[in-house]
């Protein structure tokens, strides 16, 4: 295994700065951009580019065959949602190395799914979990440990142990939200077995802070960088990312869904899976798979009970 000190242009001092900035992992370093590394490690962009290039050579980042990609995808894990129908709709559960976006109107079940997955991630692999811990970035004050207790009881789990494995950050603005996402690298590198990152909700602060067309470009640029960070973490550490999102009305829509997810094309391209949630009759929820690289569109119906999601 190549150490940071083995890379050209990296001495002991630079290696320590890299570790302090969250770049202890060689793959994390190899997938960084020169500008990102320059800012976070406080080195020149020229030096940063050389360090990244050396890390890429050490990790042998190059073209690979489709067969090799298929073999690598065998490492992808999936986390059960608690609903068999919803799991089947999305190919077996929430996928690692991917960003899954769940969007819908208020009360459609977005935060319920977030709380459910905070528990199911901790289940053994044979029971649909990944035997891992969770990061929950809460932007709208929706996280409730009492709800976690109810779901954990439903699975017969030790409530205290479940709560201890959920790392909650209350983000008060978009800059704080971005900072907490950046700090996930440090948490993982410290030895915490993070297997799911939840942001509930992704766009709340961005929408509130960047108002008007004149600020749209800045908002989308920051959002793009934020999503890039999340995808890099997902790829580097084989972690699943779940983001919940708000909707806005489509006044020109005469057919189909009268609402659309906020975040524009930047978010649309970044999300590997997009799931629309709608309220149904008798307390039921309807999940529609809107976008996926390999799965067809479809729908699933589930209910939210005291003990979690059920078919």
UniProtKB/Swiss-Prot annotation:
One matching Pfam family = Rad51
- Keyword list, A-Z: ATP-binding, DNA damage, DNA recombination, DNA-binding, Nucleotide-binding
* Binding site residues for ATP: 104-111
User: GO terms for molecular function, please?
Assistant: ATP binding; ATP hydrolysis activity; ATP-dependent DNA damage sensor activity; damaged DNA binding
SUPFAM superfamilies in the cross-refs: P-loop containing nucleoside triphosphate hydrolases, Rad51 N-terminal domain-like
Q: Which Gene3D superfamilies match?
A: 5' to 3' exonuclease, C-terminal subdomain, P-loop containing nucleotide triphosphate hydrolases
Q: Which family does it belong to?
A: Belongs to the eukaryotic RecA-like protein family.
- UniProt name for this protein: DNA repair and recombination protein RadA
Q: Which organism is it from?
A: Methanosphaera stadtmanae (strain ATCC 43021 / DSM 3091 / JCM 11832 / MCB-3)
Organism classification: Archaea, Methanobacteriati, Methanobacteriota, Methanomada group, Methanobacteria
Query: Gene encoding this chain?
Result: radA
